Amino acid sequence: MSLNTSGLGASTMQISIGGAGGNNGLLGTSRQNAGLGGNSALGLGGGNQNDTVNQLAGLLTGMMMMMSMMGGGGLMGGGLGGGLGNGLGGSGGLGEGLSNALNDMLGGSLNTLGSKGGNNTTSTTNSPLDQALGINSTSQNDDSTSGTDSTSDSSDPMQQLLKMFSEIMQSLFGDGQDGTQGSSSGGKQPTEGEQNAYKKGVTDALSGLMGNGLSQLLGNGGLGGGQGGNAGTGLDGSSLGGKGLQNLSGPVDYQQLGNAVGTGIGMKAGIQALNDIGTHSDSSTRSFVNKGDRAMAKEIGQFMDQYPEVFGKPQYQKGPGQEVKTDDKSWAKALSKPDDDGMTPASMEQFNKAKGMIKSAMAGDTGNGNLQARGAGGSSLGIDAMMAGDAINNMALGKLGAA
C-alpha cells in the first residue's frame, strides 16, 4: 500500500487487488457482491472495500470497452446487454471474452435498461450517450417523494452507475465527441495494456476515495480553501489534453481516463444517493423515510444528533390530526425505526436541512454559512458534516458495487 499523486493532481492510495476467480474473461473483475462492514472509520471493512473497488472497476471497464468499440451502433433499442452480445460475440479473443463476461454479469439488468431506453431514443431530452447506454435521463429526480413506500428507477444501482458514467463521459468529451455517434462497424478497440491501465486508474481513484475519504480529495473537508465541484479533478477533460475517446492512445492516456472516471463516480455517488432518498406520507402531517433508504437516513440522523441546538428533537404524530409530540428517540432512531410515528412537516424540514448541509460539505461549498457553525465543546458542524458525507459516500459506492 502506498500513497501516490495521480496525473489529476489528487493523492490516491494504491491498493493492490488480486484478480478473483470466476472473472469470465474480463480482466481482473471479481463477481463477488460488495457488502458493508463496521471495521472502518468510513463505514466499510477492508475486505469489503476491496471487493467494492474491484467490482466497480470491472463494471466501469466493461462500459468503457463498449463505448470504445461499439460507437453507439447496434445498441439503440436493442438493450446494452444485447448490443454487446451481437457486436462482440463473433470478434474472438478479448472481445469474445468481454462479451461473455458482460452478458453473464450485467445482461439481465442491462437488457432491462435497454428496453426502457429503447422507448426514449427519440426523445430530445436524452443525449446520444444516454441513448447508446439505454438510459432514460428523465427518470432521475433530485427528490424522490411519493405516497407509498415504493421504489423507482433511481433505486436501481445499475441504472445509477450507467447514468453517472454517461454524465462523466459527457463532461470529459462532450456530445458527439465521445464515440457514441459512430457507425455500426464500431470504433477502435483498446489494447489489453490500455484496458489494464484504465482499470488501474479507476482502481487507484476509488481506493483513494474510499480509504481516505472524499474530504481528502477536496482538501480537509473542502471548508478551508478546498476545491469544490470538478476543480482540480480533470473531470473537464483537461487531463486528457482535449482528446476525444477515439483519439486516446497508449496506457498513459487510458490510465488518466480511468482516474477521471473513478474520481467522478466517487464524487457523484454520495450526493446522488442523498438526492435519491425517498419519503412517503399517509397524510399531510405524517411522513416516513422509505424502508430502503433508512440506513442512509440513520447516518444523517447521527449527524443531526450531534447538534441539537441546530436541529432540535424530532416530532411526530400518532395519527392524522392528533397532537404533535416531541419524540424521546434520537434522530437516528426516529428516521430509521419510526414504528407508526409519522414525522411532522417541521421535522422533515430539519431532515432536509441536514441533507443539504451534508451535500454542501461533500461538494466543497465554502459559501454555505451553516457549515461554519460550532457545537458544544467547539465542534465544527462543517467537519462533522463532511465526515458524515464520507460515510454516506462509501455506503453509496458499496451499493453501486453490488449492482
Swiss-Prot record:
One of its GO terms (biological process) is symbiont-mediated perturbation of host programmed cell death. Residues 113-157, 173-195 are annotated as: Disordered. It comes from the Bacteria. Residues 113-129, 137-156, 174-187 have a biased composition (Low complexity). The keyword Secreted applies. It is found in: Secreted. Keywords: Hypersensitive response elicitation, Secreted. Disulfide bonds: none annotated. One of its GO terms (cellular component) is extracellular region. Its main location: secreted. Elicits the hypersensitive response (HR) in the plant upon infection. Harpin elicits HR in non-hosts and is also required for pathogenicity in host plants. Belongs to the harpin HrpN family. This is Harpin HrpN.
